Amino acid sequence: MSDLIQPKVLKGFRDFLPADEIERALLMERLVKVFRDYGFVPIDTPALEYSEILLRKSGGETEKQVFRFSDNGGRDVAMRFDLTVPLARFVAEHKSEIYFPFKRYHLGKVWRGEKPQAGRYREFLQCDFDTLGSDSAAVDFEILRLIKKALNELGVSNFKIHVSHRGIFNRFLKSLNLSEDSEEVLRIVDKLAKIGEDEVLKLLTDISSEESAKKILAYISGVSKELKSEDFEKTLSHLENLAGGPDEDTKRMRDIYALVKAVGIEDSIVFDPSITRGLDYYTGVVFETFLNDLPSIGSVCSGGRYDNLTALYMKECITGVGASIGLDRLLAALELLGHQKTKASFTDLLIFSLPEDDLVLSYKIVNFFEAEKINAEVYPEPKKMNHQYTYAEKKDIRWGLFLDKDSCVEEFDKAPQRFKIKLKDMTNRTEDETPLSEAVKKIRASKN
């Protein structure tokens, strides 16, 4: 017995039991429907890429978290840490085979060696949607609109999309003579929610004067004492003045917000200049989405515009904007908020097995229900009924079916609709003799 290997998973990695995986699959189905409704198409890319592909524009913090190693051929490879950088490589490699604007969605696992905590894992599922090949404010807006629609479809309504613009912040940093340190400043500011203002001020003071560090903190607080953070337009005007006046970036934000107001989703959008996104490839509008009832879990959907990402892989720059839903983090949040899981299986009806039953007849009945779009399965052997009831309970199967001991295939073949069975409602603990046609009606009614 001492030679047995202890069954366990690595820290930050997880197994998914059926109920959890069903919940995740159903959420993904809803998301895919939204993406398709908005004109997005699916792609897939490898989990493993050349390290130089993934790390050239990711930033030092990300490079520390990436799973990187030499493969059996001695190649320097890494597990993808997001789905955006592989997208840039994909577009550069397949440019002649795709069309622009290219609207894609991608659901897949990514890997980051960060510290595991509530809602944060080292292996997790991301759900990305991006549009490449257009620099229009309409495309930026459409991503925000899609975030709103997607989260609503998942049953999430109490949230805010926090929006900012890197260009405005970079212009502000230029006024402080900190342009050369802008990427480091952005990474420090991105840690504000994790480490707090005092620690951010300390880190900023390491690369600038104390006066400049305090000005940066004042900027990312976003508002003066007279302004409310919910007032997008006043906040934008305030930051515009700090950055030196109007320019194309502040115009872009006004154009986006005009579209936001036009479709009536302004209550879900807030201007938050502390949002900078730690990845170096973002160049324009950036955003993160927080649940009002559970802000501590972090952003459940984030992204932004990246105008230069494909320049690493091709001479032509193809601009893009997109977002990523952290589906596993969102599921963890829904569980913490008390949302109930849907089902433990997709089976509607279990046909019980008794010693005298004819399996041929049982499977003919399965075919009958399948034709009626009802998922049925046969318990494979005539075990004691308490075993079969437990099986149905564990799989959350509401309906059970017993064959009459005198039932025969010939009787079923003559008139399947009128063939009588015993239908057991295992939720209400009732049992009725009924023709199959009526059983179909009862089961369908319970699913609606």
From Swiss-Prot:
Predominant location: cytoplasm
InterPro entries xref list = aa-tRNA-synth_II (IPR006195), aa-tRNA-synth_II/BPL/LPL (IPR045864), Anticodon-bd_dom_sf (IPR036621), His-tRNA-ligase (IPR015807), HisRS-like_core (IPR041715), HisRS/HisZ (IPR004516)
- Tell me, how does this one assemble? Homodimer.
- Enzyme Commission number: 6.1.1.21
A GO molecular-function annotation: histidine-tRNA ligase activity
Subcellular location, in the record's words? Cytoplasm
What cellular-component terms does GO give this entry? cytoplasm
Q: Which Pfam families match?
A: tRNA-synt_His
**Which catalytic reaction applies to this protein?**
tRNA(His) + L-histidine + ATP = L-histidyl-tRNA(His) + AMP + diphosphate + H(+)
Its domain of life reads Bacteria
Query: What keywords does the record list, in alphabetical order?
Result: Aminoacyl-tRNA synthetase, ATP-binding, Cytoplasm, Ligase, Nucleotide-binding, Protein biosynthesis
What species was this sequence derived from?
Answer: Treponema denticola (strain ATCC 35405 / DSM 14222 / CIP 103919 / JCM 8153 / KCTC 15104)
Which family does the record claim for this protein?
Belongs to the class-II aminoacyl-tRNA synthetase family.
Annotated protein name in UniProt: Histidine--tRNA ligase
Q: Mind giving the lineage of the organism this protein is from?
A: Bacteria, Pseudomonadati, Spirochaetota, Spirochaetia, Spirochaetales
Under Gene3D superfamilies, the record lists: Anticodon-binding domain, Bira Bifunctional Protein, Domain 2
